[in-house]
Curated annotation (Swiss-Prot):
The protein, known as: Phosphoribosylaminoimidazole-succinocarboxamide synthase
GO cellular component: cytosol
PROSITE patterns xref list: SAICAR_SYNTHETASE_1, SAICAR_SYNTHETASE_2
Gene name for this UniProt entry: purC
EC numbers: 6.3.2.6
UniProt source species: Maricaulis maris (strain MCS10) (Caulobacter maris)
Gene3D superfamilies: ATP-grasp fold, B domain, Phosphorylase Kinase, domain 1
């Protein structure tokens, strides 16, 4: 059996050629990074959890009409996605002050923001993913005005969906990061949600205690990172109540790609 062709390896995922034209296999690694790759570790089972959580969320978003690259989960670590041309932006939606908005603007961490705030960042690790304006985006042709409008509208819809989903699970959605891509269908092109939505890309706090249940546990050396991710999965109904496995296998064993 011939090995699949690797297209790209990022910090948390590997992309392989898919079985059909226009498809990609997205493999979730156990690697954890922070501070633009300056801090690294391997957290056994993290990739499995992120795969399952992102699948659960992408399916929910698809049901309310938000176009995504997600097609189906293949196994515990992989999912089949549409091939898209990634727009080189990170779109961050903030509901509660935390992270860089607290340090930049002096807003105390944990303060509810006056309204949800959407920010754009240029996706460039070597530059530290700088925050940019819509003027920068259109001036450098990273995206069109229409694509910006589409990303803004979808981000706010995703925020509404996620707030409801996580509140129902006893979790406070502090903020999250999205990425988008261009999906070409013949002569048509549309903006779709890409990448993943997981505790790697969201700040999630327990609704009662404000305990962190996301990647900040790794950034701040708080420990129990995978356990926190597993608790998010359990509350979303993805894992068994015992916390020892997911619907189709044990998340704690770091299943290899099939």
């Amino acid at each position: 059996m011939s090995r699949r062709k690797m297209i790209y390896e990022g910090k948390a995922k590997i992309l392989y050629e898919g079985p059909e034209p226009g498809t990609i296999v997205q493999y979730f690694k156990d690697d954890a990074t922070a501070f633009n790759n300056q801090k690294k570790a391997t957290l056994e089972g993290k990739g499995v959890l992120n795969n399952r959580i992102s699948e659960h969320i992408m399916l929910g978003l698809g049901r309310i009409g938000i176009p995504t690259h997600f097609l189906k989960r293949l196994n515990m670590r992989e999912q089949l996605v549409r091939q898209v041309e990634i727009i080189p932006l990170e779109v961050v939606c903030r509901n509660v002050a935390a992270g860089s908005i607290s340090t930049r603007l002096g807003v105390p961490e944990g303060d509810q923001l006056p309204r949800s705030i959407v920010e754009f960042y240029y996706k460039k690790d070597e530059l530290g993913d700088p925050m940019i304006s819509e003027e920068h985006i259109t001036a450098f042709n990273w995206a069109t005005h229409q694509e910006i409008d589409d990303m803004m509208a979808m981000t706010l819809r995703v925020n509404d969906f996620l707030c409801g989903l996580f509140t129902g699970a006893g979790i406070r959605l502090v903020d999250f990061k999205l990425e988008f891509g261009r999906h070409y269908e013949g002569d048509m092109v549309r903006t779709v949600l890409a990448d993943e939505i997981s505790p790697d890309s969201c700040r999630l706090w327990d609704l009662e205690t404000n305990e962190k249940m996301d990647k900040d546990r790794f950034r701040r050396d708080m420990g129990n990172v995978t356990e926190a991710y597993a608790e998010v999965a359990r509350r979303l109904g993805i894992m068994k109540e015992s916390g020892q496995g997911a619907a189709n296998g044990d998340v704690g064993k770091g299943d290899a790609a099939k």
